[in-house]
A protein has these predicted regions:
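N-terminal FAD cofactor-binding segment of flavoenzymes
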Residues: 39-101
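Flavin (FAD/FMN) cofactor-binding and adjacent substrate-gating region
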Residues: 80-130
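Glycine-rich FAD pyrophosphate-binding loop
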Residues: 7, 23-44
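Beta1/beta-strand and adjacent pyrophosphate-binding region of the FAD-binding site
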Residues: 1-14, 30
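C-terminal helical "tail/cap" subdomain of flavin- and related membrane-associated enzymes
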Residues: 360-528
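FAD/FMN-dependent oxidoreductases across multiple families
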Residues: 251-255, 259-263, 270-360, 364-366, ...
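Predominantly flavin-linked oxidoreductase catalytic cores and closely associated redox partners
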Residues: 127, 133-297, 354
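Conserved Rossmann-like nucleotide-cofactor binding loop
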Residues: 14, 37, 188
Length: 528
């Protein structure tokens, strides 16, 4: 393979998008894949923040074929053969072991938070086998040197400072020489092994495991009587509850149900170690059946379902590397850390990493010194060096882990979870609008990890802190998120049903430092 400027290990969506950007910057790129497309991958649910990140990357780096992936309607028009699913919001149902679920008239046992007002600008679930293959082909079409079935075995640095990657491809020796390397695989990936990067646990985070597969024949909750009837005076939910990231929450963990447009549904569980051991999660499908037997209403939903592939068991779900970058190398956030699929944090974290590394490539800083010429345009949340990139990547992972740990602690008392979840929904909705109308207000990191008031409050009010911290939790969370609450959250009168209402964001314009008409114009352009 010819010498390149940048070797990217892993051709998932993050690696391929970074390869596309690097090619637009005029860099020579090698994109190296251990497997072969199409191939299964977990991490399938997008979000509004991920959508705007895709839009902005596409606009900044002249990648018009990337932009339709930002919204369901544009995706269907541009790429109807690339399978995705409709994600209108976030749906949560609280289950008690051994008891049937019945939607409470006061909605106290479920939560619905819309992410869009209609299908056309909705988020999506990505069938990764289709989407990753599509993005890999796009990167190759832009000139990235793509090689699959690559087994990398070593990394050395030559006397000129270039990285030399050695391995095999289909039985033949392979050598790639690059000025820099990005690991876009996953936890414990190539660079972590080759460089001996250590790992550490997230402080205070529970041990968790996961089991998942793809299914056909999964029933819709909105066609089951147990899940209907919570509206008042004919009021319907803010979106179809199944056209969402649907979560079945129970003590010790949760299940995701993500529907694709081809009749396949992704479903899996993430549970704490004690429950995993009780279920003997390593048994795969048998463990899945044991869990369904404990959740009779969920069992009914899967009564006609059949897995279309083997079950995957992850004996340790969370991971954190001790470093995310060094001289001329970096890990994408997906390779540096992983917390949990809860709240679909993986997509925006990965794309934030792509955006930051793209800025370092654009300036030349990635390779050790800024290149001559004009200073490139500053990006939202831009970092000045690979060390700064490493610091913010791991800080955001730690912050996300602290939040998810609080959510797990809140599962047994569902109202605690509902109240605490408002930290996520307030921060995410604010960031989405701020990136459109006041970018400087979005430069505090994912989930406002760098906000000197918001971030400490998120940790202080965590249900993981114990019962003493739960007194008046709802009121305390409402006060903590008030400066960034532009989505009408924390309102008892809404009874856990939150629609995507432009009026809420327009009313919150002062919190963004702009005039209401600026917000109204941005939302109108988006399609609200």
């Amino acid at each position: 393979m010819p010498d390149v400027d940048l070797a990217i290990v892993g051709s998932g969506f993050g690696g391929s998008i970074l390869a596309m950007i690097a090619r637009r910057l005029g860099l020579r790129v090698a994109l190296l894949e251990r497997g072969r497309h199409p191939r299964f991958a977990i991490g399938e649910s997008s979000s509004p923040l991920a959508g705007i990140l895709l839009e902005q990357l596409a606009d900044r780096y002249d990648l018009p074929r990337l932009k339709p992936l930002a919204a369901f309607g544009a995706w269907q028009r541009a790429y109807p053969d690339v399978v995705c699913g409709l994600k209108r919001g976030f749906t949560y149902f609280k289950h008690d072991a051994g008891r049937r679920f019945a939607a409470a008239p006061d909605r106290s046992n479920h939560l619905l938070v819309a992410a869009s007002p209609h299908d056309a600008i909705s988020d999506t679930h990505w069938l990764r086998a289709d989407v990753d293959a599509f993005l890999m082909r796009e990167a190759a079409a832009l000139g990235a040197e793509y090689a699959d079935e690559v087994q990398l075995e070593s990394l050395e640095w030559d006397t000129g400072g270039a990285a030399v990657l050695r391995g095999h491809r289909r039985g033949a020796a392979l050598c790639v020489r690059a000025r820099g390397v990005v690991d876009a695989t996953g936890p414990r990936g190539f660079l972590s092994r080759a460089l001996g990067i250590g790992s550490q646990s997230f402080p205070g985070y529970p041990g968790t495991q996961a089991l998942f597969s793809h299914f056909t024949g999964v029933a819709r909750c909105d066609e089951m009587a147990d899940y209907t009837g919570a509206g008042a005076r004919g009021e319907g939910p803010p979106y179809p509850v199944d056209d969402a990231a649907l979560h079945h929450v129970f003590d010790g963990g949760w299940m995701w149900v993500l529907r694709f447009g081809n009749g396949v549904t992704s479903a899996g569980v993430a549970v704490e170690d004690a429950l995993a051991e009780d279920l003997r999660l390593a048994d795969g499908e048998a463990a899945w059946r044991r869990l369904l037997d404990r959740l009779p209403t969920v069992r009914d939903q899967f009564a006609g379902a059949a897995p279309v592939r083997q079950f995957d068991w992850m004996p340790r779900l969370s991971y954190r590397a001790s470093a995310a970058a060094g001289p001329c190398w970096a890990l994408l956030p997906s390779a540096a850390a992983f917390v949990d699929p809860l709240f679909s944090t993986g997509f925006p974290l990965t794309l934030l990493g792509v955006e930051r590394l793209a800025g370092l490539l654009e300036s030349g800083t990635f390779f050790g010194a800024p290149r001559d010429g004009d200073e490139p345009r500053r990006q939202v949340g831009a970092v000045s060096s690979l060390q700064a990139y490493s610091d913010v990547t791991l800080a955001e992972a730690d912050h996300t882990a602290a939040f998810v740990a609080g959510c797990y602690a809140g599962f047994p008392r569902f109202d605690d979870f509902v109240q605490y979840s408002m930290f996520y929904f307030a921060a995410a909705s604010y960031a989405e609008i701020a990136r459109r109308v006041a970018p400087e207000r979005a430069a505090v990191g994912f989930l406002r990890a760098g906000d000197p008031a918001f971030a400490p409050a998120l940790r202080t009010l965590s249900p993981a802190g114990g019962a003493a911290r739960r007194a008046d939790l709802g009121a305390r969370v409402r006060d903590a998120v008030a400066p960034v609450n532009i989505a009408g959250l924390c309102e008892p009168g809404k009874k856990n049903w939150y629609a995507a209402d432009a009026a809420d964001a327009i009313a919150g314009a002062a919190k963004l430092g702009v005039a209401p008409e600026n917000v109204a114009a941005a939302l109108a352009a988006l399609g609200f």
